[in-house]
């Protein structure tokens, strides 16, 4: 099991990071929160969770241990896989997710793509008591900003990687930026995730 990798950030998109360590480039699947935390950095330490399947070995990276712990809790719920857990963590920062689960807020969970009412209820029931110890640890991850010229392109690319259609993603991102042109890419994506 890999606890963390420390190295140079070679490539960073809202859903993926390439981290070079010891001459090896590790491809990491990341959430939007992790992207925000590493937005302007060239090196970093990222916590890892490894998923081994018959057809693939995947690495999921997290800026903070609490985000990884929430990921593990989410994937322990029946019907929630790694990509769905990443989608939830991209839509809700760790502190907000802990609050949502603690207050049994079904609406906030069903607003996430791929989460229906039954899955949301299952998450709330299964994790209600497990997140209580995390409430004191939960804090907002630092936010990073990206130049406005790349916001549309990056946001659309991230939404497409998360499984949304390109046309719908472009329409949502354009509408968001029309109303708030100074938003950072991660805020645009979070808003779009709630719209789509």
From Swiss-Prot:
Gene Ontology cellular component list: cytoplasm; Holliday junction helicase complex; Holliday junction resolvase complex
CDD domains reported in the protein's UniProt record: UBA_RuvA_C
GO molecular function: ATP binding; four-way junction DNA binding; four-way junction helicase activity
Keywords for this protein: Cytoplasm, DNA damage, DNA recombination, DNA repair, DNA-binding
Primary location group: cytoplasm
Entry remark concerning the domains of this protein: Has three domains with a flexible linker between the domains II and III and assumes an 'L' shape. Domain III is highly mobile and contacts RuvB.
Family to which the UniProt record says this protein belongs: Belongs to the RuvA family.
Role noted for this protein: The RuvA-RuvB-RuvC complex processes Holliday junction (HJ) DNA during genetic recombination and DNA repair, while the RuvA-RuvB complex plays an important role in the rescue of blocked DNA replication forks via replication fork reversal (RFR). RuvA specifically binds to HJ cruciform DNA, conferring on it an open structure. The RuvB hexamer acts as an ATP-dependent pump, pulling dsDNA into and through the RuvAB complex. HJ branch migration allows RuvC to scan DNA until it finds its consensus sequence, where it cleaves and resolves the cruciform DNA.
HAMAP family on file: DNA_HJ_migration_RuvA
Name of the molecule in the record: Holliday junction branch migration complex subunit RuvA
Lineage summary: Bacteria, Pseudomonadati, Bacteroidota, Bacteroidia, Bacteroidales
This protein's encoding gene: ruvA
């Amino acid at each position: 099991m890999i606890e963390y990798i420390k190295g140079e950030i070679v490539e960073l998109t809202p859903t993926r990071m390439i981290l070079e360590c010891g001459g090896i480039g590790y491809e990491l699947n990341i959430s939007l929160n992790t992207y925000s935390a590493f937005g302007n950095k060239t090196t970093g330490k990222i916590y890892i969770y490894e998923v081994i399947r018959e057809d693939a070995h995947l690495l999921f990276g997290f800026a903070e241990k609490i985000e990884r712990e929430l990921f593990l809790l989410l994937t322990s719920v029946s019907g929630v896989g790694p990509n769905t857990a990443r989608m939830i963590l991209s839509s809700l920062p760790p502190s907000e997710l802990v609050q949502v689960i603690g207050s049994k807020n079904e609406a906030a969970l069903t607003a996430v793509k791929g989460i229906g009412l039954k899955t949301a209820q299952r998450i709330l029931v299964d994790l209600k008591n497990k997140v209580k110890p995390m409430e004191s640890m939960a804090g907002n991850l630092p936010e990073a900003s990206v130049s406005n010229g790349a916001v549309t392109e990056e946001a659309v690319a991230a939404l497409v990687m998360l499984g949304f259609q390109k046309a719908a993603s472009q329409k949502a991102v354009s509408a968001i930026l029309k109303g708030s042109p100074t938003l950072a890419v991660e805020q645009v994506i979070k808003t779009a995730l709630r719209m789509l």
